[in-house]
Amino acid sequence: MDENREVQGTPEADRRPVVTIGAEQLHQATETLQRYKQGKTNLEKRVIDNEEWYRLRHWACLRAESQKQQVEPVSAWLLNSIANKHADAMDNYPAPNILPREPGDVEEARRLSDIVPVVLQQTGFERTYSEVWWDKLIGGTAIYGVFWDGSKLGGLGDIAVEPVDVVNLFWEPGITDIQRSADVFYVRLEDNAALERAYPQLAGNLGGSTLNVSAYVYDDTVNTADKSLVVDWYYKRSGQSGTELHYCKYVNDTVLYSSENVGTPWYDHGKYPFVFDPLYRIKGTPCGFGYVDIGKGTQEYIDRGDQAIMANMLSNAAPRFFIRSDGAVNEQEYADWTKPFVHTNGNLGQDSILPVTGRGLSGIYLNVLEQKIAELKETTGNRDVSTGGSTSGVTAASAIAAMQEAGSKLSRDSNKAAYRAFREVVELVVELIRQFYDAPRQFRIIGESGRQEFVIYSNEALRPQAQGVAFGVDMGYRVPQFDLEITAEKASPYSKLSQNELALQFFGAGFFNPQMTDQALACLEMMDFDGKEQIMQRIAANGTLYQRLLMVQQQAVAMAQLADQLGGTNYAMQMLGGGQAGQQPMPGGVPDIKADGGESSVTRNARETAASRATPT
């Protein structure tokens, strides 16, 4: 999407044609790209093989060319583990909460907390989040690309957050942080006709590239003869304001766009627009390894064991016979069970035809196979309790909940890592808003009361702000900075039910009674749950309002007593009899919410607790 950035335009004075990136620089960049590609050859091969394992086509990786006719059973134990991990991730879909660092940025942080989720929704981030999680579980690495797409909204431009395939991205070998790479290359195949329409200078210059990228094994026949590799080259240079990020888009030896030639850095934040989220880290690379790498060895032995058992079953199920060469039996008629007569020549002896006696497998082989299945579940953290089941003999709800809590530790750990990557994504989104949201835009948000609200927003409050003059010294400019708090949307129905029941328990305990404000706040300080701060603020506000009401009533009674003394009226007694608030009764009869299926409250509470504990805090 970065290639559309240039439609934003810059003043002509800032677009002086300073030719810094030319054919020679492109040749050097391509050599660097080739060196980077050689450095990640093993990674690309592993990722492509893992994709075949995920698609249950791993026999293509196991069998030899001479064994294509063998029995090839495929079991989906590893796939089931990956699918459950993906479901856990989507049940804990992240939501950003932007917090100010200075008192003057409180209002802007609140507005960003409302607008950033809308921006992510408009760019289809939920689908991106799902795609990168598949990449993370299968290949071991999820990569986000946070770009500015100048073609969106009729040329106004907007943010694009997309999944990036690790096969198409190249960086300096040996580094762990992508931001420390000297150069980063993002390579994609694009249609020649589309390129010539967008860039007329490419006419007759396409084809003959020495570059190539690794490809997956597709179901369809993919013809790349009419396609060319387009390289997005990102690199950093030292500038007046510090480290500057530059961008060059080229095909073969033709420059399509160069920010350095234009004379303006690409993104003001100065970072590569890529965020890595590895599952299990590996030293010396920003990538990691996934569940396919962990479980494919065990899955191989499971399928090979199934292969031996199935081959034995088929050989024993189909009758076979020994036939003497001089037995004079018509083999075709004997093998055809529909023919009642079988012709023979001469005498038929007892040893002319003998059935082949098969041998059944011992039960120990089935036991080993079951142990391998249990090993795969154990090593991938996909035991029965984590998928809603329980081991034999365990029926108590508290015991099941305890096992589910222990089984969700791996999910909580991987979700926390995903939230750290999501925090970096949101930081880049805020920086792009700071740089490009010059024109006011309108957003539909959900207000505090749950109603739709329409707000107009621009980056005016995010731009550098003058701090004035103090003691004759210019204090310069301040750039508003924010902290990010990542929480999980309650996608699990049991988590939602648990949150709703907690609110009813607060209501039943009188937490929202303004006369019990101090007791309620003291109790809440000892508790820990999502949204605790908002509840405490609401209860404190109710208590403050109640105290003010009492003060107003006392002043009104005093004024009424004074009026009674002067005019002989009885206003004070009337106000004391019907105007002063009395002790409010404790709420009672709070209805009990039952889960579908009429299960007991003990079981329901245990399941809700287990569902909420799967959410990282």
Identify the meaning behind each predicted range.
Residues 1-11, 107-307:
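Extended, regular secondary-structure scaffolds
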Residues 1-70, 136, 144, 151-154, ...:
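C-terminal anchoring/interaction modules
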Residues 73, 85-112:
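Nucleic acid-processing catalytic cores of prokaryotic defense/repair systems
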Residues 81-82, 142:
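Small-residue-rich
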